[in-house]
Amino acid sequence: MTVDKTKKTIVIGHKNPDTDSICSAICYANLKQITSGGEYVPGRAGHVNSETQFVLDYFGMAAPKETQTVKTQVKDIEIRETKGVAKNISLKKAWNLMQDAGVVTIPAVTEDNVLEGLITVGDITRSYMNVYDSSILSKACTQYTNIIETLEGAMLIGDEREYFKEGKVLIAAANPDMMEYYIEKHDLVILGNRYESQLCAIEMEAGCIIVCEGAGVSMTIKKLAQERGCTVITTPYDTYTAARLINQSMPISFFMKTENLITFDTDDYIDDIKEVMASKRHRDFPILDKNGKYKGMISRRNLLGPEARM
């Protein structure tokens, strides 16, 4: 049988231990340590009496650490170390991370590894269905960095660290005369290489224009955009593809679950959390260490065969 050398096994005698029980645990743990190469430590299930303490002192041995219970704890089972992410990453990036890791839930954490929320595959797919709200990109306070990354584009004018936080998203499919009636201040306009359309969008005080199909932008347009405070981004995608992809640039913080999160501690007992897990529709549950920091994830599957502690 292959021994998992990363797991610690506690060797314990009977309750209310006498000298035989304590000494047997010490000897057997030492024997297993030598013969198997695994980590075996002696334990005791009760107080050390005076006779046993005399024997231990005589041979210069420390008393085994008392084990209050041998019930399996969360730290005794396999915890999936799903890496936490920043809450401002895009939906597209979160989706790609899930696919690469083969998971359906990703935790959002702070730089200090404090859990802030959970985003699931279901949350991401539901976000794609919200196609009728043309202002959702600004409501989500989407950073231009995310937009550039999602559209595989480049920023010509503006600061990619800034946020699109006011206005709607629209496609400039009509001629400039018609555009004047539906472009409003702060809007994000997706358009092509037509000089007149770019000029009209900037003059109508659009907050950002996205020029598609890798089209060049004239110096006149760049200068005017700079003067009017209009961000200019280029993308190799056509207008249809850019319009479909842009909602994937929204931060996961707008869709992730942040309230009433069900978490468990590494010291929680499996018997205590089974009922909670069974009563919830969640597939994955975050695990926190004794300092309240994010440790990893477990699911019902992890509870099928937890290893005994002794």
Where on the chain are the PLM-derived regions?
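Short, glycine/polar-rich helix-capping loops at beta-to-alpha or helix-loop-helix junctions
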Residues: 51-52, 216-223
